[in-house]
From Swiss-Prot:
Pfam families: AA_kinase (PF00696), Acetyltransf_1 (PF00583). PANTHER family: AMINO-ACID ACETYLTRANSFERASE, AMINO-ACID ACETYLTRANSFERASE NAGS1, CHLOROPLASTIC-RELATED. The keyword Manganese does not apply. This is Amino-acid acetyltransferase. It catalyses: L-glutamate + acetyl-CoA = N-acetyl-L-glutamate + CoA + H(+). Pathway: Amino-acid biosynthesis; L-arginine biosynthesis; N(2)-acetyl-L-ornithine from L-glutamate: step 1/4. It is found in: Cytoplasm. The lineage of its organism: Bacteria, Pseudomonadati, Pseudomonadota, Gammaproteobacteria, Pseudomonadales. GO terms for molecular function: glutamate N-acetyltransferase activity; identical protein binding; L-glutamate N-acetyltransferase activity. Keywords: Acyltransferase, Amino-acid biosynthesis, Arginine biosynthesis, Cytoplasm, Transferase.
Amino acid sequence: MPDYVNWLRHASPYINSHRDRTFVVMLPGEGVEHPNFGNIVHDLVLLHSLGARLVLVHGSRPQIEARLAARGLAPRYHRDLRVTDAPTLECVIDAVGSLRIAIEARLSMDMAASPMQGARLRVAGGNLVTARPIGVVEGVDYHHTGEVRRIDRKGIGRLLDERSIVLLSPLGYSPTGEIFNLACEDVAMRAAIDLEAEKLILYGAEQGLLDASGKLVRELRPQQVPAHLQRLGNSYQAELLDAAAQACRAGVKRSHIVSYTEDGALLSELFTRTGNGTLVAQEQFEQLREAGIEDVGGLIELIRPLEEQGILVRRSREVLEREIEQFSIVEREGLIIACAALYPIADSEAGELACLAVNPEYRHGGRGDELLERIEERARGLGLKTLFVLTTRTAHWFRERGFQPSSVERLPAARASLYNFQRNSQVFEKSL
């Protein structure tokens, strides 16, 4: 079977859930200059064709720097914000205008290669961002550098209803006709909040947030962000992470940080369970809970491959329905990715840990340990003193977690009488 068939099957729930949802996407000026820009545009057009409502916010920092250099002007910054005097503002307007036209042209060109070939794609914009001056901070006059005052929510909403891609530039206008240079990250964050967007997607050079060892941090809650910000200091990665967290605290369901250097990063992040970058969300990504009758189908999908390999004892749907209350499960975005069951043994103070299984894609996240801990807690709550496990393949895993070799003779009579000598499972026990 071709790989794309399986991919499409797994992506179909996401395609459905993303339809008619508002996504605000921020692409910095460095991303527009990168060789992967064409692929990013293609992915955005594809996302639009699948029914997402897109607001694209672009940056322009390197383009402004280039124009300043061409005029022999030195850039000035204070607290990582550009000081925009009158000559600098001319460079900003020139850079932003040229960049906006280039992006619109690329979006129009990419339509021919998209699933919506032959349809009309509209890129819309205008004076949709009202701004105010930052003013004087610590004695430094920022001149024409501003901050977002208001997003024209109704105006953008009408454009999205007309199936336009809304393109916002890092410029804002005041009621008195002034123009202000804005940070694209701030524009994107405020747009996502004011539009009550489903997602804020932030492009950066890195794959996402990297921890101190350089490993990708795939998921974060907003309350976990401050510790990372302290470690990251004044880096651009910290700026992206802070914007992502602020958006979530203000009601945006999910913020994503992905790389503009990696082909297909956006699609991998939005249409796979593992994602491609860093996800920041208020909601719980995974839930460890007790199983209910509605979970039987998901349990069967999880354990069937292990049953076919002979690792787990086969259980029919009827058996699972009858014994569902014995199971604890780990659920991730509607998918059961791990399970374990506790069977108290009659006429004894012992129980059996059974059917411990973890989806192969999630076997290195400590979920087996979490389930074992939950089963032990449940066993203690029932007053059980000993926990038995019978296994044919995973003896070392249990021994590393405190289980000791035992024997069939040590099993309580009610369980020993059911022992399958043909399967010849090893018996281990652990005192609780």
